[in-house]
Structures are given as C-alpha cells and as structure tokens.
C-alpha cells in the first residue's frame, strides 16, 4: 500500500490503470460522461494523474470540449501543466490508449483499489 501525499490516504494503486482512464477521456468524447460521477480525484494515487483528473472533471462539468489540446490549456490556466509533466506527458498518456472500450471496467477497478 502506498500513500497519496495530497490526500494523505493510503491505498493500493495501479499507475497504468490511472493513465488508461485519463487517456481514454482525452481521446474519446463519450468517455468522461462514463466516469465523471463514478471516480473522484482522490482515487488517483499519482499526483500528476490526480491533477489531470481534476482538470478533466472541471472541463466536463463546465461543458468544455475535452482533448489533449484543451486539457493542456486548462492545466496551463490552473498553473498545473509543468507539475503534470507538460504537454509531452499528456501526449504520452493519450498515445497509450487506443479506445475507451474497457473504460468502465478500468474505473471499477480504480474504485476497488481505493477502498
């Protein structure tokens, strides 16, 4: 078990799974509605993934279009772009995912890891 330093909670985690969820939300328009109310930022162990998910949720709730460019701009506006690894990190994460086919299952696993 590891500790998320931002939320000071201890839980098992899977960084690849976190990135799969975030990447799917960046590449497919229908992805964020599937996880927006099922996942909470504190369910992400990796700080960068937590910050990216916070930005994704805010964009979704504000009805903003989500893709790697708009997410980059949102993170920059929040002063978090460098903290998450910059635009190349966003591209790296999104390039690891080819579809959101297993997104709901991945979200379920993240929830289970957090409990």
Describe each PLM feature range.
Residues 1-113:
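Noncatalytic partner-interaction/assembly domains of nucleic-acid and motor enzyme complexes
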